[in-house]
C-alpha cells in the first residue's frame, strides 16, 4: 500500500470518528472532545512515531479532512499534533484504554469516542486518590494544552486542573497563574 492510499484510509477512519463524536458532543462536549482527541492522539502517535507514516503525513491528513468535512474546525495539522502530545503526556499516567487497545495493529479507530471514561485513572501514581475524572473531563482541550505545555509533573498538572475548574479560569487567567507559579507558591499566601 502506498502512502497516498494509507493517508486516504487514515482520513476515512478519522473522518468517521469525528462525525460519530460530533453527534454525541451536543450532550457532553468536553467528555466527548477529550475522548476523541485522546483517541486520535493515540492513533497518530502509534502511526507517526512507531509506524510508517512519513514526514508530512499529519499535514496531508489535516488538509484532506478539511476538504472532506468543509467548515470543520480544530483539526489543523498543529491541533492534530497537540492531540498527539495530549495522548503522549497522559498515556503514561492513565490506564490503557481497552476500546482502543488494538489501534496500532489494525490501524482503525474503533469507537474512539466511546472510550470507557472510568478506565481513565492514573497508574501507580501517588496522586491516584486525588485524581477526579470529572475534573479531568470538565476542563476543555485548550486548557489542557496550556497546562501540558507549561507544567512539568503530574502533581502540577492535577493542581492546575482542579484550580482552573474551581475558580472558572479562562485560558488567559490559567496561563497567567502558571506563569506566576501558583503551584509552588500556594503555601506562601497562607503563611503571610
Language-model regions: role of each:
Residues 1-192:
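Basic, low-complexity intrinsically disordered segments
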